[in-house]
């Protein structure tokens, strides 16, 4: 007969081997005290540095993050930055991170080009501190808005309503990892919701939600897949087949992912071989059942994403209105702020501007923009 202590050890080992497959992001409810600290820190940094892109501020970002952020938030992000485990979903929702003064914010502009970044300055400091705690460094991409700064306002644009871009609204934005067509895509993303009065759900999909590696996923390690440039480019820019890459990469048991369903599967000009498209469709049949659309962000919520583990998107909506009790209610249009970051400037140096190591000039899977 086994002793009670031996049986206890066996049960413990059995429990530790049970994999808890993650199917949704971790939700962290920010306390009022933490919100107050973040607001005060944001105001302090505005006075000290003027702008979140101030080189002196960016150079000492990690120091500021660890000194000024509430300790609980710092610990969560620091652990998140190096957790690639089977249980890590790859996204965190910071619920009620900040309080947004809607009157001060004013009406949502018609598009991102009309954003008043003077009103967004404080939020830029707060977002950058979160990336700094990972630690990761905010960057900008010429492939997106020809740079456009370290913070991007994402606003529905009526002229782009039907597109698969952040400016779209009238169609579901398929889940995708940010800039899947780049070899040096962002490591981490933050999405700060200033307003979401249309009550648009955010969609998230994690490669970890599949559980253990399976035969369908193993085929995605083959470097045979087209990764077309996204809908922000003109048709003539994306029509020709480019270099190929794998969809899954990194560790063979706990992989990372580069994936854009809209461009790799449903884009008629993607140029996938029949083998590649068949593999992608088999994978999509599994992946689409694992998409999580349960969370509707409120004003002041922030979603922090590991771009190598978790893809993001959103449901279709009509900008500037929502339905309540069967009635159409007019409202302010959605407004969100996106920041992207890389953990190492050394590893991206071959694709950055000579005079700005935070500015990435990659056009397509290692190819650099030719601006001459």
From Swiss-Prot:
Reactions mediated catalytically: L-lysine + 2-oxoglutarate + O2 = (4R)-4-hydroxy-L-lysine + succinate + CO2
Keyword set, alphabetical order: Dioxygenase, Iron, Metal-binding, Oxidoreductase
Enumerate the InterPro entries for this protein. TauD-like_sf
Question: What EC number(s) is this enzyme filed under?
Answer: 1.14.11.-
Q: Which lineage is the organism of this entry classified under, starting from the top rank?
A: Bacteria, Pseudomonadati, Bacteroidota, Flavobacteriia, Flavobacteriales
State the name under which the record lists this protein.
Answer: L-lysine 4-hydroxylase
Task: Provide the cofactor list for this protein.
Answer: Fe(2+)
Q: Which residues cross the membrane?
A: none
